[in-house]
Amino acid sequence: MTRRALLALPALALRVGRSIDRSRISAITDEVAPTPGEAIRFAQQYGLKWVELRAVPGSKTYYQFLSDDELRAAARELADAGLRVSFLNTGLLKFPMPGTEPVRFRNETPEARAKRLARDQAEFDRRMEDLRKAIRAAHILGTDKIRIFTFTRVADPMALLPRIAEILEPMVAVAERENVRLLVENEGSCNVATCAELAALMKMLPSKHLGINWDALNGTAHGEKPFPDGYQLLPKERIGNVQIKGRSVLQGPQWLDWAAIFQAMARDGYEGCFGLETHIFGPELFQKSHECMREILRIVDSLAPPTSASGGV
């Protein structure tokens, strides 16, 4: 072995990363149970160490809009249960950018359009304030990863990416000062919906404080094959969180090969969590969350060496 090859071994070991096991699995609490306490019991039932937060379970209020005292109480409740927050899901920039014509609102009445435009402008104007609230919540809850979006999708999203990058730049600067990472989700209704669009935006903004929340199933709404095709386009070092839609682990037309995805991401050095976002709405939502979590754990257990595999739940 040459000296150069020998010196490369530690770097290669770092890149390969650790295998995906139960310690890397998380779940969005408001989709697994109707109350915070029941969400904690769900996590404990499956031996989870992490949860993702979005809305308070049983409420439509996002955690970022809680008071400091409410956030501290939530953080204590989770810590007392042995749980940490892997990701704070916000709705930042999940609305139409003022001055654009979103595809989904083409048939609005004049009255509805006027109300929406006023609402969108107000939300745009307070984006930095909402970002600061999200960062405050993240600090109290003990996470450094915050989800953001890229405005409601227009007919030609790629043409709008430079303007989106321009808007994101000062937000990323705030994130850098506050030592948090803003993770852009590829969302079907937004301008960044596919892995190709994620990759293009990341190239425009190379800061390590802007990264990716990869929701593998979301790109299929625009004809993308998430794995391996979409995944191969992503800058792997920018992936900070992964979300697993329920329908992508249960047998059916939207099933994805998560065993292969887990193995590929471990090889590529991914060190973050994988959060269940059940998203099978209706009276069966919480039941489906249990089914999905059992299947996720079955998959990760099947990838573990026989001596370290966990017992099934």
Predicted regions: what is each one?
Residues A11-G17, F42-Q44, D80, L93-G211:
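Active-site acidic/histidine proton-transfer and metal-coordination neighborhood
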Residues A39, A74, A134, M171, ...:
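Aromatic/hydrophobic pocket-lining residues that form π-stacking "cages" and hydrophobic walls in ligand
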Residues L6-P10, I20-I25, A33-K49, A79-A81, ...:
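Histidine-acidic metal/acid-base catalytic patches
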